[in-house]
Amino acid sequence: MNISELIHDFVLALVELGILLGSLGAVLLVNTVNSAFSLGLVFTCISLLYFVLNADFVAAAQLLVYVGAINVLTVFAVMITDEPAGSETTARGIGYIITAGTCTILFSILSFVIHNTKWSDLSLIPQSGISTSGTLGSNVQQLGYKLLGEFVIPFELLSILLLAALVGAINLARNEDAFIVNKKSAASAPYKNSTFF
């Protein structure tokens, strides 16, 4: 085993440890904000795993979609909701024990199956002496050419649709905030028999 394979295995072990610790944190942490950040760690480590395995487009898509969009949306949703102050010290009852036992059994079964499977017999990639490093790097470039060449009209229509949805969501949120402020100010103001102006 040469030094590059040793470094590759070490980086893979670090990334897999990050996935394991982040997923445990996402499940076991009681504070929902910390749980959402642990989920972000899992998504980031999965993206790094794709980078290490030379799947650069899948890694970039994972990073943009899951870390950049879904996890940020989850964190915002958790921070906007009104969480009770005493939710940090919730008691763990029988449901927690059942869930932990089920997850432990599932983890044991998956570990047994993964360990006893002959992965060399299941290879879907033809084993040849041709290096595929050149084609892996050009996949993103070819995808970009297709996306902005042959599929430019659906791509632009999708961007217009997303822009309209974003503007509509901002408009709804702004009107709702103005309604809440007006409602609070009307409730706190003393009642007078006069006009609003």
UniProtKB/Swiss-Prot annotation:
An example Pfam family from this entry, by short name, is Oxidored_q3
Complex and partners: NDH is composed of at least 16 different subunits, 5 of which are encoded in the nucleus.
- Name of the molecule in the record: NAD(P)H-quinone oxidoreductase subunit 6, chloroplastic
Which organism's genome codes for this protein?
Adiantum capillus-veneris (Maidenhair fern)
Question: Which GO MF term does the entry hold, naming one?
Answer: NADH dehydrogenase (ubiquinone) activity
Record's function text: NDH shuttles electrons from NAD(P)H:plastoquinone, via FMN and iron-sulfur (Fe-S) centers, to quinones in the photosynthetic chain and possibly in a chloroplast respiratory chain. The immediate electron acceptor for the enzyme in this species is believed to be plastoquinone. Couples the redox reaction to proton translocation, and thus conserves the redox energy in a proton gradient.
Q: What broad taxonomic lineage does this protein's source fall under?
A: Eukaryota, Viridiplantae, Streptophyta, Embryophyta, Tracheophyta
The protein's enzyme class: translocase
Gene coding for it: ndhG
UniProt membrane topology term: Multi-pass membrane protein
Q: Does the keyword Transmembrane helix apply?
A: yes
Write out the similarity annotation. Answer: Belongs to the complex I subunit 6 family.
Q: Determine if Plastid is one of this entry's keywords.
A: yes
Q: Cellular component per GO?
A: chloroplast thylakoid membrane
Q: Which UniProt keywords apply?
A: Chloroplast, Membrane, NAD, NADP, Plastid, Plastoquinone, Quinone, Thylakoid, Translocase, Transmembrane, Transmembrane helix, Transport
* Enzyme Commission code: 7.1.1.-
**Where can this protein be found?**
Plastid, Chloroplast thylakoid membrane
Give the residue spans that cross the bilayer. Answer: 10-30, 39-59, 60-80, 94-114, 147-167
Provide the catalytic activity annotation.
a plastoquinone + NADH + (n+1) H(+)(in) = a plastoquinol + NAD(+) + n H(+)(out); a plastoquinone + NADPH + (n+1) H(+)(in) = a plastoquinol + NADP(+) + n H(+)(out)
